[in-house]
């Protein structure tokens, strides 16, 4: 059983926590997420044009890039995380350019060497994923695909083909941090996806509070929170780890106790 499979095999939903690499003391921030009870870590790769991200994560990208964070730095952060936390699943999330600049095979091999479990590439449509996805799968890395409220029955098979680890359901069309969609809409769309795949379905975008996270955990296999955590890094700087652990615990407790 892989680390991702193990995280989603529990009787409760998995809590997935996101922060941006290179923003603040990333190692301490990641450790705080684990200490707070996160089941899966998503580590954002900073990019100059993060089109799917809202103001909070865009600002985190700017802060990280201003410090000179590179793809190699992200991989080093991942490698050091894996050494400290051998059992916690780690997913890289970002955009195609940094992932394929040196070639998909290079990136996939580096991810494998650093103990990365999965990769979410936001801006490669599944119909155009002829190189990165196969390279990741060949290296034993799960290519995790995004489904949205506009992913209809005709397109869903393309999204699911070659997807591994879990399906990331984007609960609102648009950018991260937006207002959450209605729970009944989320429930029906998650159920629709699950009728077509045995993969777990995790829901993200617009989830900010323990109450929201707990409600979604009753209808999905996982809950992803990013902007609310990233905002703490921007607001509290060196004091962010304590704040992150506190919010992560509240979110994880709500997710784990929802069923």
Curated annotation (Swiss-Prot):
It catalyses: (1S,2R)-1-C-(indol-3-yl)glycerol 3-phosphate + L-serine = D-glyceraldehyde 3-phosphate + L-tryptophan + H2O. PROSITE patterns: TRP_SYNTHASE_ALPHA. Tetramer of two alpha and two beta chains. This is Tryptophan synthase alpha chain. The alpha subunit is responsible for the aldol cleavage of indoleglycerol phosphate to indole and glyceraldehyde 3-phosphate. GO terms for cellular component: cytosol. SUPFAM superfamilies: Ribulose-phoshate binding barrel. Gene3D superfamilies: Aldolase class I. Transmembrane segments: none annotated. Keywords: Amino-acid biosynthesis, Aromatic amino acid biosynthesis, Lyase, Tryptophan biosynthesis. It comes from the Bacteria. The keyword Nucleotide-binding does not apply. Pathway: Amino-acid biosynthesis; L-tryptophan biosynthesis; L-tryptophan from chorismate: step 5/5. Belongs to the TrpA family. Its EC number is 4.2.1.20. One of its GO terms (molecular function) is tryptophan synthase activity. The keyword Lyase applies. The active site is at residues 42, 53. InterPro entries: Aldolase_TIM, RibuloseP-bd_barrel, Trp_synthase_alpha_AS, Trp_synthase_suA.
